[in-house]
Amino acid sequence: MLFELERVTIERDSKVVLQDVTASLPKGASCVAGPSGSGKSTLLRLLNRLADPLSGVVRYEGADVRERDPLELRREVCLVPQLPALLEGTVEENIRFAADLAGREPDVTRLLDLAGLGSSFASRYSGKLSVGEQQRAMLARALALEPRVLLLDEPTSALDEEARGAVEATLLHLRERVKVSTVLVTHDLAQARRMADWVVRLDEGRVVAQGPVKEQLAV
């Protein structure tokens, strides 16, 4: 398994967000699904130590994530947040910023292509992009780190139907071209069926089901 959570509990503002969660996420395309407030985004942040549990263990490729340097882990297991958080400046400058953190010289044109953006977007200013374009620029910036895992926190929740379809198509196409596992957070079970092979379902901070999407989310 790529990730394993064993009896994980975490609190925020003295409120239990996840309670006694035991779950597994394999390599490939996984998702964490559930209603708003079920703890999905918190679980995602445990995977690269943007949050640490109150109790229990989170393992990445069999090793406790607390044994890893947090910054190194976050370059390898990269979060694309729900709301775009681009730096001021051009898309290329955003990509180069991430690549510099990883000590790499980025192929900007290729990264834009992987993210479903044309080369002309390199010189576009982040503040002039639509929300859907910002989301794909965030993806290009994340890919500049050459991560092994992408954590996708509700990447289409703020998009209209057309933009949502474009981002989904980009992610599906990306998996065919790059060896990267994805963990998608979504409240939309139809999206989970389209985008993932494995699902962990949460409700009120507890796991209520997990396994292959075809079994757990059968129509």
Residue ranges and their predicted role:
Residues 150-154:
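Catalytic Walker B motif of ABC-type/P-loop ATPase nucleotide-binding domains
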Residues 125-129, 133:
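Conserved ABC ATPase signature
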Residues 161-163:
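Helix N-cap at the start of a conserved alpha-helix in ABC-type nucleotide-binding domains
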Residues 56-64, 73:
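Conserved ABC transporter NBD signature motif
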Residues 105-121:
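Conserved ABC ATPase "signature" region
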Residues 48:
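Helix-to-loop junction immediately C-terminal to a conserved catalytic motif
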